[in-house]
């Protein structure tokens, strides 16, 4: 079912409002908004869809952080609208030459080896760039790393990414970084 941009904005605002109400009632208010799945991918590519989502967040609670796929439209638009933004990369997904996720139908779309995924994350953070399946690097802000829970071995991968990232990245910080 397709929605108009206005309908999308209102639906997102409603969902954020409901999530805020329930989470606040439970004593754990949400702090960020992340579009999931197809909507997240659409906010990466479409300035219009990203704008509708960002307008909804800004209207409901402009203090919420917008967690966006690195290098996408949503990240840029959220910043232009004065929202707090954080760019996210995926430990378990491959990137094409444009910096977007490789289709799950293609080879290289899903990374399954926890050690390789963790080492790649360290390289990307150090380079400040997304590593594509060809080995090229595309500049990107990297402030969050996601491991999809439905990836085989997701728990092990997340643990490995955390361990290797902490060990390798923390060891290279200077006193000014701390």
What are these regions (language model features)?
Residues 73, 77, 85-125, 129:
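Active-site rim beta-loop-alpha module in soluble metabolic enzymes
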Residues 46-52:
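Charged helix-capping and loop-helix junction motifs
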Residues 154-166:
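C-terminal helical cap(s) of enzyme catalytic domains, especially alpha/beta-barrels
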Residues 1-25:
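Glycine/small-residue-rich loop that forms an oxyanion/phosphate-binding "nest" at active or ligand-binding sites
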Residues 33, 147:
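Conserved, mostly hydrophobic/aromatic
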Residues 1-9, 43-44, 100-112:
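Glycine-rich tight-turn/loop motif centered on a GG-T
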Residues 63-70:
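Catalytic beta/alpha-barrel core
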Residues 167-174:
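Conserved small/polar residues in nucleotide/adenosyl-binding loops
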């Amino acid at each position: 079912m397709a929605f108009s941009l206005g309908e999308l904005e209102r639906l997102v605002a409603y969902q954020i409002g409901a999530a805020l109400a329930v989470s606040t009632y439970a004593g754990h208010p949400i702090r960020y908004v992340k579009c999931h799945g197809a909507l997240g991918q659409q906010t990466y590519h479409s300035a219009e869809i990203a704008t509708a989502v960002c307008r909804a967040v800004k209207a409901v609670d402009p203090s919420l952080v917008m967690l966006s796929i690195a290098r996408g439209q949503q990240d840029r638009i959220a910043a232009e609208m004065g929202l707090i933004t954080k760019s996210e990369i995926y430990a378990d997904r491959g990137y094409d030459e444009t910096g977007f996720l490789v289709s799950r139908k293609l080879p290289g779309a899903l990374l399954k080896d926890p050690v390789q995924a963790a080492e790649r994350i360290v390289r990307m953070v150090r380079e400040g760039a997304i590593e594509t399946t060809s080995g090229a690097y595309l500049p990107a802000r990297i402030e969050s790393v996601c491991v999809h829970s439905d990836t085989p071995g997701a728990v092990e991968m997340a643990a490995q990414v955390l361990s290797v990232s902490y060990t390798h990245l923390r060891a290279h910080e200077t006193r000014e970084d701390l």
